[in-house]
Amino acid sequence: MAKPCGVRLSGEARKQVDVFRQNLFQEADDFLCTFLPRKIISLSQLLQEDSLNVADLSSLRAPLDIPIPDPPPKDDEMETDKQEKKEVPKCGYLPGNEKLLALLALVKPEVWTLKEKCILVITWIQHLIPKIEDGNDFGVAIQEKVLERVNAVKTKVEAFQTTISKYFSERGDAVAKASKDTHVMDYRALVHERDEAAYGALRAMVLDLRAFYAELYHIISSNLEKIVNPKGEEKPSMY
């Protein structure tokens, strides 16, 4: 019976892997000790900005440069008195909501950053999982629980990206309907409703981002010993 062979790496390849691991562990250390506390504070400051504390949502409305057609002639007009039916004037360039776009420019990078940090933490913990063998696996179970939670946060953050894309799609549809059926005022109102709903969603995103960072800080720092030293070795090390 053939013996299973181990992974054979050249000396140079092994060096490159070791450098990657060292950089990974250093990034994880910086993330936990420096980045996380600062990010929680910076998001708290962002939530105090005027742009995220708009009380009158009607002030968020962007002007819709969509011509309103003249009302139809009265039914009792004589056919000879009626003018030829005029074609509805076409719309020109319709920009997006500048206030929402400015807010999106602040929030989108924060969403991307948290997603990348989740990937960093996941990769870091995966590299700390010891060789599977009989013995005390309590620490490994904790690693798996933390990984499960970080993956859940990553999934929620990815849903934020979908929400942002959906805003443009739904608002675009509403604007298209308003420009096509210019006599239907409800379509114009729908555009404003989309903007107001998006504003509320963006503020909620920032609140959630801050909460996720706080959760990551708590769950990692509370279980750090078992994460970096799952087998209870004498000399635990993040590196």
From Swiss-Prot:
Gene3D superfamilies: Proteasome activator pa28, C-terminal domain, Proteasome activator pa28, N-terminal domain. Residues 72-87 have a biased composition (Basic and acidic residues). Pfam families: PA28_C (PF02252), PA28_N (PF02251). Induction: By interferon gamma. Residues 65-87 are annotated as: Disordered. The modification Phosphoserine is found at S10. Coiled coil: none annotated. Keywords: Acetylation, Phosphoprotein, Proteasome. It comes from the Eukaryota. One of its GO terms (cellular component) is proteasome activator complex. The modification N-acetylalanine is found at A2. One of its GO terms (biological process) is antigen processing and presentation of exogenous antigen. Belongs to the PA28 family. Implicated in immunoproteasome assembly and required for efficient antigen processing. The PA28 activator complex enhances the generation of class I binding peptides by altering the cleavage pattern of the proteasome. PANTHER family: PROTEASOME ACTIVATOR COMPLEX SUBUNIT 2, PROTEASOME REGULATOR PA28. Heterodimer of PSME1 and PSME2, which forms a hexameric ring. This is Proteasome activator complex subunit 2. The lineage of its organism: Eukaryota, Metazoa, Chordata, Craniata, Vertebrata.
